[in-house]
Amino acid sequence: MRRLLCLLPLLLAACSSPSGNASTATDIPAMQTIDQTVGAGAVAKSGDTVEVNYTGWLYDPKAPDHHGKKFDSSLDHGGTFTFPLGAGQVIKGWDEGVAGMKVGGKRTLLLPSAMGYGSRGAGGDIPPNAALVFDVELVSIK
């Protein structure tokens, strides 16, 4: 009985460990961009209004492509998303990660939480301090 009481705190600590918690966020140290297709059109720069298709996932270090749970996609909403590049109207990772893309280009953005939603997270889909993955296609520059 005494041995059981000694093991009980260890068991409770193991059960409360964040490694078993599905909502625990994984972060990465810096932004990474991977061009899937470079594109052949004009180059997006700060001040341009850009039109993109995108899909966003939580970063998963165990997945080969780091694409975890999908949380949003312009394709699910039936259209593109338009925003002024560099104006701070989207997350920092988008302002920095879309800049330099060519029209027709497709790029994967791996974003640390500080370039996404940081310690606040977003709604019920993006936990605090979560790294994000976005596949972005630059459709046009307006």
Question: What do the predicted segments below correspond to?
Answer:
Residues 2-142:
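Cross-family detector of peptidyl-prolyl cis-trans isomerase
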